[in-house]
From Swiss-Prot:
Catalytic residues (positions): S59
InterPro entries, sorted: PCMT, SAM-dependent_MTases_sf
GO terms for MF: protein-L-isoaspartate (D-aspartate) O-methyltransferase activity
PANTHER family: PROTEIN-L-ISOASPARTATE O-METHYLTRANSFERASE (PTHR11579), PROTEIN-L-ISOASPARTATE(D-ASPARTATE) O-METHYLTRANSFERASE (PTHR11579:SF0)
Protein name (record): Protein-L-isoaspartate O-methyltransferase
Organism: Pectobacterium atrosepticum (strain SCRI 1043 / ATCC BAA-672) (Erwinia carotovora subsp. atroseptica)
Protein purpose: Catalyzes the methyl esterification of L-isoaspartyl residues in peptides and proteins that result from spontaneous decomposition of normal L-aspartyl and L-asparaginyl residues. It plays a role in the repair and/or degradation of damaged proteins.
UniProt-listed Enzyme Commission number(s): 2.1.1.77
Lineage: Bacteria, Pseudomonadati, Pseudomonadota, Gammaproteobacteria, Enterobacterales
Statement: the UniProt record of this protein carries the keyword Phosphoprotein: no
Pfam families: PCMT
Domain of life: Bacteria
Keyword terms of this UniProt record: Cytoplasm, Methyltransferase, S-adenosyl-L-methionine, Transferase
């Protein structure tokens, strides 16, 4: 039954323009039902966002795939994730690169994500309880930064932690949000707009 649901989801993602086979293989390998509440397990392979508690959500699989594809990852990419959340996006990244650094503002979510990743034998992840606006400077610079909550503007600390040639993908805005791709080239930042999106806000400075 689960296999059929995964096949249906992968077919939907392909129809929506996701082409990276390595990414699709990672999505197939990560059991999304392990990252949602028991009450939502039957919806785990629907292409929809789901609540995970503390006012946060697990992003819809299409958005996870789209944002990950935009990062243009190689196995050697040094990756920073802002907003560990359930750990689902983290797990996808962990299948694609040698190591992932992930920052989560809410301690309970960080602990749960860490436990889930360990249960799935994904040991190439470092998580930290901290303010996503500040990134993780001591582990930088990064080739790729993915932000899974929306700041009203691009955080300066994250721009500083993006390496030359690096790519950052994030939603930006308050009431209306736009998915943006930021590339660092010759010390300058080139910003491209992708599409309108809806994410929870990236809360600044306030740990929970």
């Amino acid at each position: 039954m689960v296999n059929k649901r995964i096949e249906t989801l992968l077919a939907q993602l392909r129809q929506q323009g996701i082409e990276d086979e390595r990414l699709l293989t990672a999505i197939e390998a990560v059991p999304r039902e392990r990252f949602v509440d028991e009450a939502f397990e039957h919806k785990a392979y629907e292409n929809t966002a789901l609540p995970i508690g503390s006012g946060q959500t697990i992003s819809q699989p299409y958005m996870v795939a789209k944002m990950t594809e935009l990062l243009n990852l190689t196995p050697e990419s040094r990756v920073l994730e802002i907003g560990t959340g359930s750990g689902y996006q983290t797990a996808i990244l962990a299948h694609l690169v040698q190591h992932v650094c992930s920052v989560e503002r809410i301690k309970g979510l960080q602990w749960q994500a860490k436990r889930r990743l360990k249960q799935l034998d994904l040991h190439n992840v470092s998580t930290r309880h901290g303010d996503g606006w500040q990134g993780w400077a001591s582990r930088g610079p990064f080739d790729a930064i993915i932000v899974t909550a929306a700041p009203p503007e691009i955080p300066q600390a994250l721009l500083e932690q993006l390496d030359e040639g690096g790519v950052m993908v994030l939603p930006v805005g308050e009431q209306s949000q736009i998915l943006q791709v930021v590339q660092r080239h010759a010390g300058e930042f080139i910003i491209k707009t992708v599409e309108a999106v809806r994410f929870v806000p990236l809360v600044k400075g306030e740990l929970a």
